[in-house]
A protein has these predicted regions:
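Amphipathic alpha-helical core segments of compact helical bundles
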Residues: 31-34, 53, 64, 98, ...
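Short secondary-structure transition hinges
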Residues: 35-72, 80-92
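Hydrophobic alpha-helical connector segments
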Residues: 10-43, 94-97
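All-alpha amphipathic helical-bundle segments outside canonical DNA-binding/catalytic cores
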Residues: 23-24, 62, 80-96, 114-119, ...
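Secondary-structure edge/capping motif, primarily at the C-terminal ends of alpha-helices
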Residues: 15, 44-48, 104, 108-111
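C-terminal peripheral helix-coil segments that are non-catalytic and often amphipathic
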Residues: 73-77, 81, 114-148
Length: 148
């Protein structure tokens, strides 16, 4: 588990380095996470939580430190670059993002196999990005998605 999380951290740090701006960074990170979700059956997460408390604690710590900090930094970056709205608290939005991931992975609302995690995450991140970007960012996002 620690090796997997280390690999994830390295991949997400790489996305920051390779990205042109905060939108690209979030798109690269999201694509990676979406691909990871594609292979996860939510019952596995439930089993980890129920039967492997130590592993679950590691996952929770990773989510509420590394992921939260990464999203918060992304929001500050987007505001600084002038492509995200600047009229909200980045910490609140980052916590909402992590909470949304919990909701997606929980399996109570988006039951598997009716709702595939990768599809739910893709829709959630699309909604998240569109809520972050201002008009300049939206223009960039639309061009970026059109050329993807």
């Amino acid at each position: 588990l620690n090796q997997k999380l280390k690999k994830d951290r390295e991949k997400l740090k790489q996305s920051v380095e390779e990205s042109e701006n905060a939108i690209d960074e979030l798109l690269i990170m999201s694509k990676y996470i979406e691909e990871e979700f594609y292979s996860i059956n939510p019952s596995i997460l439930h089993d980890i939580q129920k039967y492997h408390a130590e592993a679950w604690e590691i996952l929770e710590k990773h989510k509420w430190t590394f992921v939260l900090n990464g999203i918060e930094k992304n929001i500050f970056r987007g505001i600084k670059e002038g492509i995200y709205h600047n009229d909200f608290d980045p910490t609140i939005i980052a916590k909402l993002y992590v909470g949304k991931c919990d909701l997606i992975m929980g399996g109570e609302i988006f039951e598997y196999p009716e709702h595939k995690l990768d599809r739910v995450f893709k829709d959630a991140i699309s909604f998240h990005i569109r809520g972050l970007v201002n008009s300049k960012g939206l223009n960039y996002l639309q061009k970026r998605l059109k050329n993807a």
